[in-house]
């Protein structure tokens, strides 16, 4: 039996607020310890990330993206199935130019509804084709400066 709708809704709101706050601790605050994150489409070949993987990635990524804004366009919450979908636009400034992306995020709640247990996220493929090489180049060119963040 799924968790009560109001518990899931509160968790969903905390997830959105954590994302909007754009800090690693805030964004991960209501992820379960066994939460996984999968980048979509599946054909992108990006490996499944564990919470531990994300705890290493987010501080680096978030440190490179300033003036982050989140604009939520749609939220669909299917309480009987224990899941939700968020469609959002994000913007940020990076050392290598502006970042603008669209996200469709699919969330699954844990049994009691107080944590997000599974995430699947679809990004705008056109944006990512342009952004990822710039990100990779910046990280490679600044490895010494960013080194401590990668440990």
Swiss-Prot record:
Pathway, per record: Secondary metabolite biosynthesis
Keywords on record: Monooxygenase, Oxidoreductase
GO molecular function, one term: monooxygenase activity
Keyword Oxidoreductase: yes
EC primary class: oxidoreductase
Covalent S-S links between cysteines: none
Family label: Belongs to the avfA family.
SUPFAM superfamilies noted in UniProt: NTF2-like
Gene: nsrQ
Protein EC: 1.-.-.-
Role: Monooxygenase; part of the gene cluster that mediates the biosynthesis of the tetrahydroxanthone dimer neosartorin, which exhibits antibacterial activity. The two different monomeric units appear to be synthesized by the same set of enzymes, among which the Baeyer-Villiger monooxygenase nsrF is the key enzyme for the divergence of the biosynthetic routes. The pathway begins with the synthesis of atrochrysone thioester by the polyketide synthase nsrB. The atrochrysone carboxyl ACP thioesterase nsrC then breaks the thioester bond and releases the atrochrysone carboxylic acid from AacuL.
Organism: Aspergillus novofumigatus (strain IBT 16806)
Name the record gives this protein: Monooxygenase nsrQ
């Amino acid at each position: 039996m799924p968790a009560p709708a109001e518990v899931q809704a509160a968790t969903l709101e905390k997830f959105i607020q954590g994302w909007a706050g754009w800090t690693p601790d805030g964004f991960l605050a209501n992820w379960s310890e066994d939460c996984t994150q999968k980048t979509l489409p599946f054909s992108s070949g990006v490996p499944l990330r564990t919470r531990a993987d994300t705890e290493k990635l987010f501080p680096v990524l978030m440190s490179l993206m300033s003036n982050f804004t989140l604009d939520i366009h749609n939220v669909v919450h299917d309480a009987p199935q224990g899941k939700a979908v968020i469609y959002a636009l994000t913007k940020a400034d990076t050392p290598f130019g502006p970042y603008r992306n669209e996200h469709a995020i699919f969330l699954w709640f844990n049994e009691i509804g107080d944590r997000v247990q599974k995430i699947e996220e679809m990004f705008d493929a056109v944006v990512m084709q342009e952004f990822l090489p710039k990100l990779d180049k910046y990280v490679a060119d600044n490895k010494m400066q960013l080194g401590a963040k990668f440990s």
